[in-house]
């Protein structure tokens, strides 16, 4: 079994960035979901669930370490990383509230024009990251702006089984993974507790609960009329009302991940 694909999402709900290699640490892959768009009025986070145009945002790091934002019909914008303790803004992501630095008026204007709504862009420095949901992980674990956990793993074998049941292929990016592994039986990951990739050990914390987000085509931004893959997932991956696909992870320590690395099951 090996690591076959590696992705990060610099802006929450923005486009994926496929990687060949990446540093990984406390908050997951370097630069993953460290930026988030929030309502200007109340600091509430926005996602593609309600704001599909977020999916048009292509974000990357430029040579100077600034965030480069691109979207159809808009001039590219470079956004400096704000100081960790400056221009703090109260924001809400699900049940969590935190104070994080605002990225400034230029980024806010660029995003507000794209979305047709008054919004701000915020950044999560490591020292302002969130605790994980109650009951999961260690007290030392943290997450930036993912829904709850620093890393998400998808097993390619499970995706192929889902494709077989649906009758057509589903893009892996519908599930917003960070790590994709190849060479395991379908849903073998349900039984994993600890894995090793390269020299790093990862704890498998809980299955990922899926939602309507997965019905959005990552290329076109349109929802599938037949509600796939959720419709099929509900027939065999529903537990106590939750639809489960993929596993949430946390890493012990920090290091380097590269596509092709061997994946070992430790427990």
Residues covered by each model-derived region:
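Metal-cofactor-dependent catalytic cores
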Residues: 1-267
């Amino acid at each position: 079994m090996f690591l076959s694909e590696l992705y990060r999402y610099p802006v929450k709900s923005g486009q994926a960035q496929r990687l060949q290699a990446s540093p990984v640490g406390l908050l997951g892959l370097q630069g993953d979901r460290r930026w988030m768009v929030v309502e200007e009025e109340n600091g509430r986070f926005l996602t593609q669930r309600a704001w599909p145009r977020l999916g048009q945002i292509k974000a990357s790091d430029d040579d100077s370490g600034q965030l480069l934002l691109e979207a159809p019909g808009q001039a590219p914008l470079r956004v400096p990383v704000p100081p960790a303790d400056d221009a703090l803004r109260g924001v809400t992501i699900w049940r969590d509230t935190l104070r994080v630095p605002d990225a400034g008026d230029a980024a806010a204007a660029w995003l507000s024009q794209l979305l047709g709504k008054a919004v701000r862009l915020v950044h999560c420095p490591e020292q302002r990251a969130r605790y994980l949901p109650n009951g999961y992980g260690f007290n030392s674990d943290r997450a930036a702006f993912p829904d709850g956990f620093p890393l998400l793993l998808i097993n390619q074998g499970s995706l192929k089984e889902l494709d077989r049941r649906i009758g057509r292929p589903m893009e892996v990016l519908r599930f917003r993974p960070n790590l994709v592994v190849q060479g395991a039986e379908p849903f073998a990951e349900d039984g994993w507790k600890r894995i090793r990739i390269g020299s790093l050990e990862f704890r498998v914390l809980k299955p990922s609960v899926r939602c309507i987000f997965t019905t959005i085509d990552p290329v076109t931004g349109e929802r599938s009329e037949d509600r796939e893959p959720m419709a099929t997932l509900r027939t065999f991956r529903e537990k106590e009302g939750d639809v489960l696909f993929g596993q949430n992870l946390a890493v012990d320590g920090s290091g380097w991940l590269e596509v092709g690395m061997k994946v070992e099951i430790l427990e």
